[in-house]
Amino acid sequence: MPDSITNGGRPPAPPSSVSSTTASTTGNFGTRRRLVNRIKKVDELHPAQENPTMGSHWLSEQERSRLEAVQQDWRRTRPMKFQWTSKKRPDDPTTSSPSTVSISNALENSTPSLNNVSSITNSSSPFSLSSAATSTASAIIPFTSNVATNHPHLNHHVSRIPQAIVTGGTNGSLPPLLISPTSAAAATPLISGKAGPMSPSTGSPINVAATVLQNAVSSPQHSIFDRSRLNKIPPNTSLASSSSPSDAANNDKPIQQRHSILSNVRTLTQAMVNDGPRTLTGDDMDKMVSEEERARKEQEKREEEEKAARRIDVEDDFDAQEKPIDKSKNGRFLKFDEELGRGSFKTVFRGLDTETGVAVAWCELQESKLNKTERQRFREEAEMLKDLQHPNIVRFYDYWESADLCGKRKYIVLVTELMTSGTLKMYLKRFKRINIKVLKSWCRQILKGLSFLHTRNPPVIHRDLKCDNIFITGTTGSVKIGDLGLATLKNKSFAKSVIGTPEFMAPEMYEEMYDESVDVYAFGMCLLEMVTGEYPYSECMNPATIYRKVISGVKPECFSRIPAQYPEIREIIDRCIRVRREERSTVKQLLVDDFFTPEDLIGIRVEIKNRDADLNDLNVEIQMQLRVYDEKKRKQYRFKENEGLQFAFDIENDSPDEVVQQMIEQQHIPDEDTRMITKLIKDKVDAFRRDRDHRLLEIKRAKEEEERIREEAEIKEELRLRAEAKEKEKERLEKERLEKKAAAAAAANPNPTPIPPTPATPHSSAQQQPIPPPLSTQTSAEIQQSAQQPSVPVTMIANIPAMSPTSAQPQPVLSPTSAAVPVPTTMIHVPKPSEIPVQNVATTAAPVAANNVPPSPAPFKTEDIQTPTLAQNTVPRTISTDASGLVINTPASIASPSPAPSATDVASTTAPVTPAPTPTTTTDGGAAAASTTTENKEEKRKSNKRKVVMEILGCDESRNFALVSCRLDTSHKSVTFQFAPGTDKPCTIATKLLAEDCLLKVHVHIVEAQLGEVIQLINSDGKKGVGTKLATVLDPNSTEPPTITAVMPKDSSAATASNTKPKIEIEKTPPTRDASQEPNNVQVTNVRKVSQESNAESVQSIPRPGGIIVMSPTNQTDSAPPPTGAAAKPSRFQVTKSADPIATPISSSISTATVIPIVAATPTNITSEPVIVQPITAQVITHLATPSPVSHSLSSNSSPSATTHSNMSSIQSTTSVPGRRFTVQPVSQAESGISSSISTPHPEPTPAITSCPPPVPSVPPVVSNGTLNLEVAPKQTPSATNQNVDTQHSSSTASTATLVSETPATVHVTPISVPAPVQEPLVIDHHSDVLTQLDSELRKCFQVSGVSHSASPSTVVESLTSMTPQTIPLACQTVPASIGQAPAVIAAAHAASLIPNASVPQSPSRLDAETGLAGLHEKLEALKMEQDRREDMGDDAIGTTTTDGKDEIPIDTLKGLAEALGKVIHADGRETTPMPPDHPDLTDASTQQLISPSNPDVLTTMSSAVEGSASSTMIEDIDASTSAVDASMMNSMPPGAQNSTDQIPAAMTLSMDQECAQSMTSSITRNTTGTKLATFENLETALSSTLGTHIRQPNAPSSRDETTAPMTPSFTNERIGGGGGGGATSFSIGTPPSHSPFPVSECDYDLKGQMDLESEDPEVIQMIVRHRMEQHKLLEKQRVEIERLRSKIRVPRATSVNPEMIGDDEADTTLTALQSALGNASLSLPASPPPNTEIPDNEGQHHCNSFRCIGDPNDNVSIVNQIKQRLGIIPSSRQSVRSATSSSPSTPPSSSSAPPKSLSSPTKSYVSHCSLSIGYGSTASSEQQQREPSPSATTSSFLSDPATGVIENV
């Protein structure tokens, strides 16, 4: 057989001589490539139609390729004469015949020898052709390049020779092989003769046969298993048959022609092999060229015809695909022969729903592995799945069971919705990152689909949710969950690896016990894959590894690669993939999560402030914030875009419905959003509860795991020690046996030789290991006895002369130490004998008592010795000696304490043993040194042991709960404390003791264990447990847990010990954060500590009791028990900056207690000397703004709700009226630091004041967006009176009030235009009871806590005006250098009335609005005093409006006063007002040197008088204070200042503007932020109107976008008498006008000062008018309500006014200056009253603004004037006015001095009104307008009437 056949059809390698000629055969590859492309196109356009019985639709790709390979191998072994190889071709037999015949003839006629060879081609055997072809391997056919180039068809036929020989090639197919022609560019001319064709490149002959055979082997082979080529095969790619030419001619003429050509070629090649190469003649070549051209044209024509036929076939195939191949039983669904997908469990075909015309998915499932039961279960579940219709669930239409045509194979058909856009997995591969909005949308839809499944009855569990089963519709973006039926089948049908995808399977799925939570777990893994783009657990190599990680709770590695900017996604995934299914979130809970809630759908969010901190604590109260994102909805709310409504919520007691109802009542939210906000709060609280429970469970579980590990380690250690002890015991017995044997031998031998010592056994490890207590009762010799010490009797078993082997002289075994130390103790801990080697006993024994004793070789006398043990028990021991050493045996049982040894023994004391290194001479020196070191270690261990003893002193069961008194004795200190065993936990008590520095950290666990025992004893029998002592010895060197030893009392006398012992009282409170965790902050001294929240350095996870009152042993007083009254629920809402981390409680909502008022001594010179107004200095503000370490830690680490509960309350509120719990705060403001709007134009060095006591903790930082201008006079009188203060921490503010020191000071205070942080109210001692009662009643009314960490700025003034620099903390002494240069005269009390009250809710500051009533008595007193002063001056006009009395509220009682204030102080929404810009300092030196009174006692009088308003004795203080202020202020003014009233307001204004930012510089550095003044205008206006002080002089613009024009010196001339340059001012005492003369909206500042309203829009004007009407209504209502109050307090006015101290002229001048200074106050109006559409005309307004004559005795004359008139001491008020107006150097000519008329004249009436240019304001009289110096109608100023001296406001 030829080599080509034996080699598998591969031809032999061509000869080396012609191997290089094959490179020229690559020219025809282009034609072959085109043919291959045509065949591929045929495959694509017309796929093979397979037999239905053996179709490939049920085979996978791998199986199909394997089948084809088998078929090819089979066909390769079959003969070629088959019908499928000789089918008719659609070729025209007439087209190719001439060319092929002519070429054949040309080849046959070329040489006569070809005929001899041509017979080979007629052979019917296929091998004959092979042999012939093989023999021509070396034949060379002479072709020219032209023939090869111009006749590719001939070359193609020639190239097929080897393919016909090898019977179909390697795989039975015929590739299009070509002989590569030579290049046309390098073509060579014909060479006649014997020269064969030459290669153009090498010049060597071309081996055609070798090239043909090589192409046949190396060309790509194509599969013949393609029916498209069986029916229609191109002529150039048809199979070459090996049949004879005669058969081919009968069947297929084109094939016959082809074979004839090939036969001729083979004959020619054979001839060339035999005869050698020869060249073709010219005629032969011409014929060949012409035939080839004709054949090529005919081939092109056939190709065109084939293309047209293919197009027709494609159309026919498409029609065939639309023909259904199967249908459902009911005929509704059709199946088409179009496979869409294939999986391990199903095959999906395209289907059609004939009812709807929608394409569906026809899924065929294998049923062979389902048993009968599982089929039945699937039928039931499939029926249920048919009813599931949801937009996010792939629709399940129908199912049935079917069989194939033969009926052998059964399968289940599922018809579902067809999803053509792809799966989520495909999208994740296509897009590396998904947009967060898209991710939210997809997750939301997935959760909706799962929620629909889980809410069915029964719930439907998907079981196989993963990204491959989630389908996405690309056109709409909708997501649907699919493969529900498959998940149902996969439940229990297959192996566990097939139940689901291991990466997405929950741990319980492996145990086949699961519920809907497995879908939540799978969703978490899907979300993880969507976020990270990584497959979960891709790091695992097999399902077993995944299983181990899943069940152990190890998260995938990609979990750590979640983007850091999405912490909420990490939290959601963590909640979904928890190991315990009960800890996972449900689908419903995930749907309500904020992350999946679209903002455009709801527009409102509820957030929890400091959520992480609250999760770790047990606070029942959390701070929540409501924010509005929808701009349309925001218009209905009372806060702005960057603000949120913050409120406190008690998760145990509060109800979302109640909280939302309070919001509606306080007009924070509209009614239509009630249900939505209620649901948001409820969902948020439920999620918080669930997360907190999980967090606590995790902490508990971690502790349990640690405890379990520790116990296991202890058990292992104990077992190991026991094993070692057993070994040692065996060694000891062996040694004893040897010793006895040696002793017997020594006794038998009287003159023994020295016996060498026994080799030491390894014992180093035993010496280091502690022995358990049961095994530590045996001891070895630790007491080294001298050989001649007679005081310790020793019984010797054997007397052995102990001689050292290295010494020539004999030495005793027990040699004395060189420096023995006496041991004055009997308490010795003796370890086991086996711990010390026998031969080293003598050297390791401790010295007992000896001096240097000479050694004695004589034998020892054996005696007995008794050694007391640790428990002072005497245990007899027997000491036996031999040459090896000394052994002491001790009985295991310890007897009761025995008498001490005899007098000759060692003296017994309680001092511990103090071992010293004792060099000894023994038989083994190295062992002796090691033994000495061991001895020292043992003694050190003994000295390091400490004992913790707790004794139960008593149990008081008289209360509702038992109260146990205990005493704890430690090495640190002894302390006595009380606790309630029923409610207090040991860990809580121990933590409190540690916080109070009563306990060391190392003793915490011991004390907790002892307290647990105490609680058990008390619970079992409280009386019998009294007197029990629990002792625990703490050995730091031991790994064993300490053991508690209980000693029961012999009598019950110890039960009364608690009455004489100091104690720490731990009182139970609701679970809240413990703030007293710093031992350094609390000292056990004579200071009484009540605060439970003075500090909070870290978040605690356990509940703690309230406060621990630590008393020294000398202080025997008991603390008051906690109040039992019902706690009131105060106001909780506050609008806050929602972006701020609320560190300090913004609203002390739910606060149940108040701080006991701080009492200071009252000076005795209140009315005996001029009352001086205390300065409101920047030092004071600095002090208030400086956060204490306590408050700072509270604000940074503690929850805002942690400080809302107080254990010690001075008020027992029983009312439950809904108060103010909501506050509005900005969302973008920083936690601390002043507002960015505050600037510091004059940065100068700030001098420090050194006369200050040590700093006292103050309030936390507050926000202030306004300006505060406080100026100090150059002079101050430092005369301080030190007072003892009972310092008490506040649970709301964690701050300590400052001592009020009555120190006179000469200062001037400018109008305060910004609220400042405030301290607790300052209370005077002799009115403390009345003040406490009033404070309690007011707080009951308004539901506020007793202390405010952000009270109103007016409280700041009062609390600060009583402070001298001596009382300011050192940390608060940084003040601007400019302070004290430009002061202005103002009464501090009245300044307090100008500052708005903090009770206004919508303050954008960090002030706690609801606690703004702290210090309310100072405000009321200041307002009342100003009212009295105005009445004294007689410059108020009585309003014409009368009172009907229907709203009268009596205020002669505290309840009435509180009710009246409740009418005034209400929840009003306000918008903020920016600060006025800074202005240059235009004042001169003379103006800046104004001096104010020098006595600060006025505030003390004011504070005490107002709180005792119910008492008639306080009227004297009020009048005295008023007169003193008037007199002292006027007396302290320089002459220039008294004659220059116009300079006073200018000085005040300019100095305030100049020093505004500088006065706040220090507060900026202390993380304080200003509060915008305008937000407090509501309460100020209300209170001022109520008490008759209608003063309102704004100077700040209300618009955020507009600024105030800089003040110029021209304003100084315009503000005569206190007029403000930017706004009009009206003074009205008594009955207010029917129409308010004040600006009623923030825009009025701009309207009156800078804008011309004639060009304003009608909407703006309408809003202004509406605001004015609202103000008018409010003022009228307040006036009616308060009129009764005045009548109640007129009669009890005291007559103790000192006429000498009252200067009416000075007081009037002071009032004028005060009125001028008040023009700088930026105040606003309430927004809560309903709008009033009635707009009175100018005439009505003029009438309402007309006031009767000032000082008319018949019409509502002021109270003070009546009293003073009766006393005959009232001066003429016009003198002060005249002195204030006529002496001004800058007064206009119209206001020159003139004799004033009587102020009480009824004929004179001056209208005080506001002059505006908008047509609806009050119209000034022509006379007033003529005198008006203002250049414009919008500029107002104060003028003095030269005729009357009455100040008018134009």
UniProtKB/Swiss-Prot annotation:
Keywords: ATP-binding, Coiled coil, Cytoplasm, Developmental protein, Kinase, Nucleotide-binding, Serine/threonine-protein kinase, Transferase
Molecular-function annotations in GO: ATP binding; molecular condensate scaffold activity; potassium channel inhibitor activity; protein serine kinase activity; protein serine/threonine kinase activity
Cofactor: Mg(2+)
Family: Belongs to the protein kinase superfamily. Ser/Thr protein kinase family. WNK subfamily.
Gene responsible for this protein: wnk-1
Polar residues bias (residue ranges): 776-790, 1077-1101, 1208-1217, 1806-1820
Low complexity bias spans: 16-26, 234-251, 890-934, 1188-1207, 1771-1805, 1821-1832
Reaction equation(s) it catalyzes: L-seryl-[protein] + ATP = O-phospho-L-seryl-[protein] + ADP + H(+); L-threonyl-[protein] + ATP = O-phospho-L-threonyl-[protein] + ADP + H(+)
Protein name from the UniProt record: Serine/threonine-protein kinase WNK
Entry GO CC: cytoplasm
Subunit structure: Interacts with gck-3 (via C-terminus).
UniProt feature, compositional bias: Pro residues: 751-760
